[in-house]
Curated annotation (Swiss-Prot):
The lineage of its organism: Bacteria, Pseudomonadati, Pseudomonadota, Alphaproteobacteria, Maricaulales. Its EC number is 2.3.1.275. It catalyses: an acyl phosphate + sn-glycerol 3-phosphate = a 1-acyl-sn-glycero-3-phosphate + phosphate. Disulfide bonds: none annotated. SMART domains: G3P_acyltransf. The keyword Cell membrane applies. It is found in: Cell inner membrane. Probably interacts with PlsX. This is Glycerol-3-phosphate acyltransferase. Belongs to the PlsY family. Residues 192-216 are annotated as: Disordered. Residues 192-201 have a biased composition (Basic and acidic residues).
Amino acid sequence: MTSLLIALAAAAGGYLFGSIPFGLVLTRMAGLGDIRAIGSGNIGATNVLRTGRKDLAALTLILDAGKAGIAAAVFGYFLGTTAGLVAGAFAFAGHCFPVWLGFKGGKGVATFVGTMLVVFWPVGLTVIATWLAMAAIFRISSLAALAAALAAPFAALAWGRPDVAIMAGLLTVLIYWLHRANISRLLKGEEPRIGGKKSETSADVSDGDDPDTPAT
């Protein structure tokens, strides 16, 4: 199989696996209706939490991270490191822009973490540690997510993995674009804090994040 065919296979497989909308599937199975009709309309764990089911939100978080990690691991094992990187990146794209749901999905933080943990675990651990540290200091979930994503390409470069740094950098750009409403509220000082109450303005935005969980 040529390099181009390997890349195409990894991209297609990663995208299709990443596009499985676990948040939507789980909430429908639980009789909670269409998760896209509440909150931000996203399919990630953050919005699932708005149903009041912390167990489903936690399971969604694990599955969303896991699907990207599994895609990267499977293609990386059978087709090589580059294929693993491509599969992980496209699993991220599939989660954020699933074809089955009109290309409206989650914000990609969980799938980003899952991908990083598999393609190069030191970077994945750096992302998790950065999120935890920023969340503990500033108590703002979206800020922690943005800082964690930004840390990834620099960590990859520090560890001598420019290939991972390039992929992480591209995904970080997408994460920032998907969090543009959050960034706007951060600049205005209106982003809610973890454990705090939302104002009416920030509570009803179309793509906001719950302050009690990482944006996913």
